[in-house]
Amino acid sequence: MATGRTHRPATRSRGIPEATVARLPLYLRALTALSERSVPTVSSEELAAAAGVNSAKLRKDFSYLGSYGTRGVGYDVEYLVYQISRELGLTQDWPVVIVGIGNLGAALANYGGFASRGFRVAALIDADPAMAGKPVAGIPVQHTDELEKIIDGNGVSIGVIATPAGAAQQVCDRLVAAGVTSILNFAPTVLTVPDGVDVRKVDLSIELQILAFHEQRKAGEEAAAEGAIPAAASKESADKGPDGDVPAVMPA
């Protein structure tokens, strides 16, 4: 089976925008769910709703893939699953190493969704000598001294960093020097990498802060709406006459 070193997705060479690439996994997840239910075709409106995007944007995204659907029928679900999987490079095996096997790293190692999406956890690596040899998700943890040999021996091009912030840059440098060209960073720090290396940062605390912002805004809108009700009632009361009736408008 081919490995991540032998092929890279064609999305860049075909000029597919990064925003479109970021939405392709959303479409693939929705399409996979439809495929599992043996749904043969899907309209752009139905798929857009399932993926949580605008249908016009979905049609534009699919035009980059050369998929325009059939009027009155929609899109072929199985073909789209294959087409998007191919664009994302998921029709081959991608060996991945996870560095930092604390609580987060162990949780990532135990995540079953990697294998079903074409990502094979080739190795788990940690700097703690006491962790060496201990199995996590059925994979023995290896010491960071073995990092370069592990990368080379497994043809790894994707690395996951789940270390403390203080160790992340050094780990990143070693991964890149060993040949890793794509990094998923869970450490709460910004990594510096050379040209040609892609980094995707996942910061759960930032995502929670964004949710807190939206919660605060919703609370403010609700408070403003509740304050508007008494104001409207006061105005209505002021408009009424001494007997509680609204005065008639006299003709000019």
UniProtKB/Swiss-Prot annotation:
InterPro entries: CoA-bd (IPR003781), NAD(P)-bd_dom_sf (IPR036291), Rex_DNA-bd_C_dom (IPR009718), Tscrpt_rep_Rex (IPR022876), WH-like_DNA-bd_sf (IPR036388), WH_DNA-bd_sf (IPR036390). Residues 222-252 are annotated as: Disordered. Gene3D superfamilies: NAD(P)-binding Rossmann-like Domain, Winged helix-like DNA-binding domain superfamily/Winged helix DNA-binding domain. SUPFAM superfamilies: NAD(P)-binding Rossmann-fold domains, Winged helix' DNA-binding domain. Keywords: Cytoplasm, DNA-binding, NAD, Repressor, Transcription, Transcription regulation. NAD(+) binds at G100, I101, G102, N103, L104, G105. The keyword Transcription applies. The keyword NAD applies. GO terms for biological process: negative regulation of DNA-templated transcription; response to redox state. Residues 26-65 bind DNA. HAMAP family: Rex. Homodimer. Belongs to the transcriptional regulatory Rex family. Modulates transcription in response to changes in cellular NADH/NAD(+) redox state. This is Redox-sensing transcriptional repressor Rex. It comes from Streptomyces avermitilis (strain ATCC 31267 / DSM 46492 / JCM 5070 / NBRC 14893 / NCIMB 12804 / NRRL 8165 / MA-4680). The gene is rex.
